Design a protein with these regions (language model features):
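Extracytosolic secretory-pathway proteins
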Residues: 28-373
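N-terminal secretory signal peptides that target proteins for export/translocation
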Residues: 1-8
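Bacterial N-terminal signal peptides
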Residues: 10-22
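Sec/Tat signal peptide C-region and signal peptidase I cleavage site
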Residues: 23-27
Length: 373
C-alpha cells in the first residue's frame, strides 16, 4: 500500500473524530404519566370567616328556607328526605327543581342563576399554592407556602376552599379529588408529558410536550401508577401542546406560558383548558416529579363538571351546586365578557404528581409487529 493511502486514511479518521468530538451532545428525552391531579389547596385553620360551609344535609335545610319554607316545614321535609321511598323521592325532586322563574320550578343544576344565592363562604387566608399569573401584587393575591412567592393567583382555591371536600394541603389530598380522580383514571386515557433537552440532569433549556395516551393509566394494588410502562401517544392534535421550558436548580418549569388543552372524561370533566399555563415540578428521590400546574381556566367548564352529576354529585361529594356557581362567578378574575363585563375565566392551580414511563408514537414498529412491553 502506498504511503499516501495511509496518510489519506489517517486524515479522514482524524477528521471524523474531530466532527464527533465537536458535535453537540445528543438530545435526551424523559416521559411521564400524570398519576395524580387535584385542586392545589392550602387550607389553614381559621381561613374561612364564618367557618367551613355547612354539610350537604344542613345546606339542604337552608335551601328550603330560601324557598320560603318555615324552619318547621324545612325540618319535616328533611325527615322525609331521610326516610327514602316515595316521600324521599318527592323531596329530592323539590331539591332538584329548586330554581324559580316567574314562580315556576326550574332545574337548579341547569339554571343555577334561578336559585337564590346561598352565600357560601370563601377563603380569606394568606396562603395559596400557585403562580403570580398577572405579575401584580393585588389584594386577592396569596403567598405560596412552598416557594414564598407573593401575589399568587389561585381564585379557584379561594372559591372552593371553604367546602370541606375541597380542603387540603400540598401533602394532604382533598376528599373530592381523591374520589373523582381515582374514578377517572380507570375510565379515561392517561395524560402524558415528555421533557427533551441536551442533559436533563443539568440546568438548561428544555422542551416540554403534553399529550394524551391511547391507554388508560396502569396502576398497582396501592393505586399508584406503575413506572416504566409503555404508553402510545394519541395522535389527536387537540391534546398535543409544546412549550419552551427550562430546568433551573433542578426544578422544571415552563419559560414561555401558553395555552394547554387536555381531553379528559367526555361525561364529566370534559377537558382541561388553561391559558398562560405555568408549571413547576421538582424531582423526588424515586424519580417521580411533583409540583403545580396552573393558569386561567374557563369557570363554566368547572361548573359543568360539578353540575352534570346533578343531585347525586351534590348529595355525595359536593355541598351546594348552585352555590358553587355563585362562588365561581364572584371570584372569577380574568377574560371579561365584552358585553357584560363578567369575568369568564378564573385563576387556578392544580397539584400534580408524575411517574417515569415510556411514550412512543401510536404507530411505533413495536406495536405494528404485535410486540409490546
Amino acid at each position: 500500500m502506498a504511503l499516501h493511502d495511509f496518510r489519506t486514511r489517517g486524515f479522514l479518521w482524524a477528521f471524523a473524530l474531530g466532527l464527533a468530538l465537536s458535535a453537540p451532545a445528543a438530545a435526551e428525552t424523559r416521559s411521564y404519566v400524570i398519576e395524580w391531579f387535584s385542586l392545589a389547596s392550602s387550607s389553614q385553620d381559621g381561613d374561612c370567616p364564618g367557618g367551613v360551609n355547612l354539610p350537604t344535609r344542613e345546606q339542604y335545610f337552608k335551601s328550603f328556607e330560601l324557598l320560603g319554607k318555615t324552619p318547621e316545614e324545612a325540618k319535616a321535609l328533611m325527615e322525609e328526605f331521610a326516610q327514602g321511598g316515595v316521600k324521599g323521592a318527592n323531596v329530592r325532586n323539590m331539591l332538584r327543581m329548586r330554581g324559580r322563574v316567574n314562580g315556576e320550578p326550574t332545574n337548579a343544576f341547569v339554571y343555577p342563576w334561578t336559585v337564590a344565592d346561598p352565600q357560601l363562604h370563601a377563603v380569606a387566608g394568606k396562603y395559596g399554592l400557585g403562580f403570580n399569573l398577572d405579575g401584580k401584587q393585588g389584594p386577592n393575591g396569596f403567598q405560596d407556602p412552598v416557594t414564598k412567592e407573593a401575589g399568587v393567583d389561585n381564585q379557584l382555591f379561594r372559591a372552593l376552599g371553604c367546602i370541606e371536600q375541597f380542603r387540603g394541603t400540598y401533602d394532604y389530598r382533598p376528599t373530592f379529588w381523591a374520589f373523582i380522580w381515582g374514578s377517572m383514571k380507570e375510565t379515561t386515557p392517561a395524560w402524558l408529558f415528555s421533557v427533551d433537552g441536551a442533559n436533563l440532569d443539568r440546568d438548561g433549556p428544555v422542551t416540554i410536550t403534553f399529550d394524551r395516551a391511547i391507554e388508560h393509566q396502569v396502576f398497582g394494588a396501592t393505586g399508584d401508577a406503575t413506572a416504566d410502562v409503555t404508553y402510545r401517544i394519541d395522535p389527536d392534535p387537540r391534546s398535543h401542546h409544546v412549550f419552551k421550558g427550562e430546568i433551573r436548580n433542578g426544578e422544571l418549569s415552563i419559560s414561555a406560558p401558553g395555552d394547554l388543552v387536555l381531553l379528559l372524561d367526555t361525561l364529566s370533566f370534559t377537558e382541561l383548558r388553561l391559558r398562560q399555563t405555568h408549571l413547576r415540578l421538582k424531582p423526588r428521590a424515586n424519580g417521580n416529579l411533583e409540583g403545580v400546574i396552573g393558569g386561567y381556566q374557563p369557570w363554566g367548564d368547572i361548573y359543568f363538571s360539578f353540575a352534570q352529576g346533578g343531585l347525586a354529585y351534590e348529595g355525595m361529594i359536593l355541598n351546594d351546586t348552585p352555590g358553587i356557581y355563585y362562588l365561581l362567578k364572584k371570584h372569577a378574575d380574568a377574560e371579561p365578557d365584552p358585553n357584560t363585563g363578567q369575568n369568564t375565566a378564573i385563576s387556578a392551580a392544580y397539584r400534580i404528581e408524575a411517574v417515569p414511563v415510556f411514550a412512543v408514537p401510536a404507530d411505533a414498529a413495536i406495536y405494528k409487529a404485535g410486540g409490546g412491553r
